[in-house]
Amino acid sequence: MSISARNQLKGKVVAVKKGLVTAEVVLEIAGGDKVTSIISLDSIEDLGVKEGTELTAVIKSTDVMILA
């Protein structure tokens, strides 16, 4: 699959915390840094996401939130 987004981070899923409708997915990227995303349970199922899965996080610059 080819996409135009330039902000892509490859890594391995190190945690999946499922809620009622969504799940928190933690991806460990190069250098040991972690990226956390909230995605739907349907997406978890469709993509086969589980601990150990190799994934690429695609980040749209207009959808970034910074927490302090």
UniProtKB/Swiss-Prot annotation:
The lineage's top-level taxon is: Bacteria
Enumerate the UniProt keywords alphabetically: Molybdenum
Query: What Pfam families would the database entry show?
Result: TOBE
Q: Which Gene3D superfamilies match?
A: 2.40.50.100
- Domain named Mop: which ranges? 2-68
One of the GO BP terms on file: molybdate ion transport
Query: Which Cys pairs does UniProt list as disulfide-bonded?
Result: none
Query: What job does this protein perform?
Result: Binds one mole of molybdenum per mole of protein and contains a pterin.
Please name the NCBIfam families in this protein's record: Mop (TIGR00638)
Report what the protein is called: Molybdenum-pterin-binding protein 3
Instruction: Name the species this protein comes from.
Output: Clostridium pasteurianum
